[in-house]
Design a protein with these regions (language model features):
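N-terminal first transmembrane alpha-helix
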Residues: 1-63, 144
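Lipid-exposed faces of alpha-helical membrane segments in multi-pass integral membrane proteins
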Residues: 22, 26, 30, 34, ...
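Pore-lining and gate-forming transmembrane alpha-helices of multi-pass membrane transport proteins
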Residues: 23-24, 141-157, 161
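Juxtamembrane/interfacial segments around transmembrane helices
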Residues: 29, 70-82, 169-179
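Membrane-water interface at transmembrane helix exits
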Residues: 35, 39, 43, 47, ...
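Charge-rich cytosolic interhelical loops and cytosolic tails of multi-pass membrane proteins
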Residues: 40-104
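Transmembrane alpha-helical segments and their cytosolic interface motifs
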Residues: 98-144
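Cytosolic/matrix-facing juxtamembrane and C-terminal tails of multi-pass cellular membrane proteins
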Residues: 154-184
């Protein structure tokens, strides 16, 4: 027979937990939920600060010329003239991504891009929630928290951009250096 000492359980309720600490899991859950509701185009806008912001929108107008691993002649012979329109560039690049998505370099770059993209948008959500809460509550060290969240957002944004740019270049490099398949 095992006896449960109820007095220990009652003492747990007396343990002083600050409301800020107790609400942290709720805030994290809300951030994850809100992040899941944000469409990927808006997340790209949060990271790149421009319209047509998905990584592939500048694949053939910018990135194709910015990486020495990319064989331009080979890529042109496989794909023909590069599209000028950002949406057309993204469509063509996305088809190449699907072709090479099993490559470990592409897979890892894609995973890191998505990780940093979501972390960036969640940080911005936390920043906005914190900003809104300052109108209702007096928050100790609010300026420090603002600066910390802003710094975190900027670092994550730069990391997201770097991962996205690397993903685009990796796909273009793989396509330009892979042997042409008959029927391609």
């Amino acid at each position: 027979n095992i006896k449960l000492d109820v007095s220990l359980l009652q003492n747990l309720y007396l343990f002083p937990i600050k409301a800020e600490i107790a609400s942290a899991p709720i805030i994290i859950f809300l951030c994850i939920l809100i992040n899941a509701l944000i469409p990927s185009n808006l997340k790209a806008l949060i990271i790149f600060w421009r319209i047509d912001a998905l990584p592939g929108h500048r694949a053939f107008s910018h990135f194709v010329f910015s990486d020495p691993r990319i064989n331009l002649d080979s890529l042109r012979s496989k794909l023909g003239e590069f599209p000028d329109n950002p949406r057309s560039q993204n469509l063509l690049w996305y088809s190449l991504l699907k072709k090479h998505e099993s490559n470990i370099t592409v897979k890892e770059a894609h995973q890191y891009f998505l990780l940093f993209r979501d972390a960036t948008s969640m940080t911005l959500i936390i920043f906005l929630l914190f900003f809104a809460s300052t109108f209702f509550y007096e928050i100790h060290m609010a300026k420090f928290v603002f600066l910390m969240l802003l710094g975190e957002y900027l670092l994550l944004m730069i990391a997201s951009r770097n991962m996205a740019n690397g993903l685009v270049k990796n796909v273009l490099s793989l396509e330009s250096n892979s042997p042409a398949i008959k029927g391609d």
